[in-house]
Amino acid sequence: MHQKMNKLKSVAQKIEQMIESAADRWRALPDNILTFRPSENDWSTKEVIGHLIDSASNNHQRFVRLQLTQQLIFPDYGQDNIRWVSIQNYQNRRWEELLGLWRYYNIQLADIIRSVDPSCLNHVWQLDANDTVTLFDLMADYLRHLEDHLDQITATLAAANAH
């Protein structure tokens, strides 16, 4: 259990460091760079940040609810995340608002991860009839998901600057 808690403390610290670093680098980017889509099927930087806000809000519910119950049945939005981004119109939102919401939501998640009740780490989210994920795995994987999308944003910004 001690190893898992140390791992999660490291995850929380990395989330905070990544968020602060990215927010500092991206705060002053112009809208034409932020709305650039490398192809018609790709998201812009604004849309990726919007998706990460959706991810944070869904994971916030999971992280808290899984400390209240041993097994959680909660919908997975993954199959609909393109629609989530479209419905919320992230492409046309003010950048300062998106970046701020993303930053603060992740600071909140890092704090939840850091202070999780160790006795709840094996509580499970029931994805479907056959698949479950523990709270520990959800929290640890959140960092990987964040890193993947920050890499996506880095590539999108490079393409926008080369365009």
Can you describe what each PLM-predicted range is?
Residues M1-S21, A158:
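Extreme N-terminal tail/first-helix region
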Residues K4-K7, T45, R83-E97, A129-D137:
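Acidic/His metal-coordination segments adjacent to aromatic residues that form catalytic metal sites
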Residues I15-M18, R25, R83-N122, Y142:
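Acidic/histidine-rich alpha-helical segments that form the ligand environment
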Residues E16-A23, K46, H60:
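Short amphipathic alpha-helical segments
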Residues S21, R25-L34:
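N-terminal first-folded block
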Residues T35-N81, A110, V124-H163:
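Short, contiguous alpha-helical
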